[in-house]
Amino acid sequence: MAINPITRNKIKDYLNSFIQQQLSVYRERSLREFQDVDSYLPSLSKDGDLKPFHASLIPASIMRLNRFERSLSTGLGSTFEECTRLIALDHHAVALRNYDIQAALDQAQWAAIDQLISIIDRGLKHQTPSLNQMLEQIQSIPLTGILETHIVRADLYIQRHDGSELFFEIKSPKPNKGQCLEVMQRLLRIYTIKQQSAVPVKAFYAMAYNPWGISRASYRSSNTKKYTDFSNAVVIGQEFWSLIGEPSTYTELLEIYHEVGLAKSAEITQKLLQ
């Protein structure tokens, strides 16, 4: 078993608390019901969430459920980060969220990273260079002798028992262009900071699941493929969770999410459909 019973319970408690918090927020938010045109149109909303056409067609309880689902989906990314941390602690020496690396590098190296990202952004290369190609460019530039200190934050940091290090940026599997460029910049900075490390270092853009299917070959995001080193920098679904734990980690974690969902489904329906 990749996720031991104690960790399973910690994950369940965390997910229960997450859903409860989401429910509390949405139970407290009033939703203007559509009784008739004359009473609805003069309504005011400080949140800018009046939708006269939606409200006239869809019952308020269903609208509330829809809002809850969208909010839950937005916040779900934070649950992936915490679950990876909890699982990783069972398999590795260290696992930390929001891990900061502070380093002083030559001014020319920071500038070279930004220039490479700008080249990718403007599409000046037919294909995004590999991480290794970009790192070779960064390491070969003439240095100025002027040091600049920057802080780079990783969503998740893991130190394995052999001392090797893993850095993960855990982001949406359907990123926009800006998100891809931001992650690539961060990965290049991490690798450049760690270039003299005595232990092996790997940094990845991690996606908790693949929206197009189970296999890597089925993945279809054009932004990811165009603006990242997809072959070497990106890990998706099971390949990501296997790095965190074992080959069965992904399916075991999904089972935990499902168990929590089944246990909370009646409460969610009752509270949001009232």
From Swiss-Prot:
Keywords: Endonuclease, Hydrolase, Nuclease, Restriction system. It is an enzyme of class 3 (hydrolase). Signal peptide: none annotated. GO terms for biological process: DNA restriction-modification system. It comes from the Bacteria. The keyword Hydrolase applies. It catalyses: Endonucleolytic cleavage of DNA to give specific double-stranded fragments with terminal 5'-phosphates. Its EC number is 3.1.21.4. InterPro entries: Restrct_endonuc_II_TdeIII (IPR019045). One of its GO terms (molecular function) is DNA binding. Belongs to the TdeIII type II restriction endonuclease family. This system is more active than isoschizomeric RM.HgiBI. This is Type II restriction enzyme HgiEI.
